[in-house]
């Protein structure tokens, strides 16, 4: 079976690796173009999928768009049986969707139709969802609207971070995709339309959302911290030894106590919220590495959180 793989971030890599490992012929990898990196943006960094594909000698294509006739002709010339799409980052026009003999299949990190869109992992945690999952669906022209082929649910534990859920769903996605490809080869892959009710959209995370608002209930603050960990990272300003610093908050738990929002309630970094309190568990100063709260506080005095 001739496969074109389309993906960009680290999340996609285990799925690409599994497809290669199970003997499928990956004839091309499509990924986002290299992006500027470094302090001055003078270096170009290739995506994780780009790096992995080159390790296996797979031709890599990095178009900025697939809307043009030339790019669509190149894609069609690959004569793929199927295209596998996992967090690629570009919308696929009808000409691309129709080119593979068996269609295009997407690995999506939510229980559709909940959390269609760009940031399903973060949004599920930030909303306080108790479960999510991984789904394989056949793509159509809508945004994550196609019929579902396979799904697996995953519980979201109370202190689970987006990073932990990301890794779990990526591995589940690899297993599901291999099962889906096998069923596709056997012509036994059943498709079920998505439910019409329960549709929500997982908008891309805005930088403004990363600043913690201590006037919100503790549950919401906690969900924001873990939903934005490790990237882009929730943050606040702290008065440390008399100077105000910006600090990233990577882990937290629900705490006990109450007070004016932002009040430091004890020497374990329990912070009062609009309702209840949150205990900060892992913090990161600018230019430093994430540290457990006890280590972060060594020799430091936090008097105020803004």
Swiss-Prot record:
Source species taxonomy: Bacteria, Pseudomonadati, Pseudomonadota, Alphaproteobacteria, Hyphomicrobiales
Protein name, UniProt field: Methionyl-tRNA formyltransferase
GO cellular component terms, A-Z: cytosol
S-S pairs: none
CDD domains tied to this protein: FMT_core_Met-tRNA-FMT_N, Met_tRNA_FMT_C
SUPFAM superfamilies named in the record: FMT C-terminal domain-like, Formyltransferase
Gene3D superfamilies: Formyl transferase, C-terminal domain, Formyl transferase, N-terminal domain
Keyword Protein biosynthesis: yes
Name of the top EC class for this enzyme: transferase
Matches recorded under PANTHER family: METHIONYL-TRNA FORMYLTRANSFERASE (PTHR11138), METHIONYL-TRNA FORMYLTRANSFERASE, MITOCHONDRIAL (PTHR11138:SF5)
Keyword terms: Protein biosynthesis, Transferase
Residues that coordinate or bind (6S)-5,6,7,8-tetrahydrofolate: 110-113
EC code(s) of this entry: 2.1.2.9
Function: Attaches a formyl group to the free amino group of methionyl-tRNA(fMet). The formyl group appears to play a dual role in the initiator identity of N-formylmethionyl-tRNA by promoting its recognition by IF2 and preventing the misappropriation of this tRNA by the elongation apparatus.
Organism, as annotated: Brucella melitensis biotype 2 (strain ATCC 23457)
Domain of life: Bacteria
Catalytic activity: L-methionyl-tRNA(fMet) + (6R)-10-formyltetrahydrofolate = N-formyl-L-methionyl-tRNA(fMet) + (6S)-5,6,7,8-tetrahydrofolate + H(+)
Record's keyword annotation contains Transferase: yes
């Amino acid at each position: 079976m001739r496969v074109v793989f389309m993906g960009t971030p680290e999340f996609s890599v285990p799925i690409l690796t599994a497809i290669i490992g199970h003997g499928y012929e990956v004839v091309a990898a499509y990924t986002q173009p290299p992006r500027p990196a470094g302090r001055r943006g003078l270096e170009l960094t290739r995506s994780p999928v780009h790096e992995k594909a080159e390790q296996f000698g797979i031709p890599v294509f990095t178009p900025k768009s697939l809307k043009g006739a030339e790019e669509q002709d190149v894609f069609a010339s690959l004569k793929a049986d199927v295209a596998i799409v996992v967090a690629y980052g570009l919308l696929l026009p009808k000409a691309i969707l129709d080119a593979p003999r068996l269609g295009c299949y997407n690995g999506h990190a939510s229980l559709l139709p909940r959390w269609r869109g760009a940031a399903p992992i973060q949004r599920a945690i930030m909303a306080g969802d108790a479960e999510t999952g991984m789904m394989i669906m056949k793509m159509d022209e809508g945004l994550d609207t196609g019929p579902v082929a396979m799904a697996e649910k995953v519980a979201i534990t109370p202190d689970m971070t987006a990073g932990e859920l990301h890794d779990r769903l990526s591995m589940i996605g690899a297993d599901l995709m291999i099962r889906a490809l096998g069923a596709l080869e056997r012509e036994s892959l059943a498709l079920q339309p998505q439910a019409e009710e329960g549709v929500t959209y997982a908008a891309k995370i805005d930088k403004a959302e990363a600043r913690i608002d201590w006037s919100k209930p503790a549950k919401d603050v906690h969900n924001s911290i873990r939903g934005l960990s490790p990237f882009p990272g929730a943050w606040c300003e702290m008065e440390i030894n008399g100077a105000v610093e910006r600090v990233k908050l990577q882990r937290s738990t629900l705490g006990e106590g109450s007070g004016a929002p932002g009040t430091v309630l004890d020497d374990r970094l329990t912070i009062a919220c609009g309702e209840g309190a949150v205990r900060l568990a892992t913090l990161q100063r600018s230019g430093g590495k994430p540290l457990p709260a006890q280590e972060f506080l060594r020799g430091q005095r936090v008097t105020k959180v803004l």
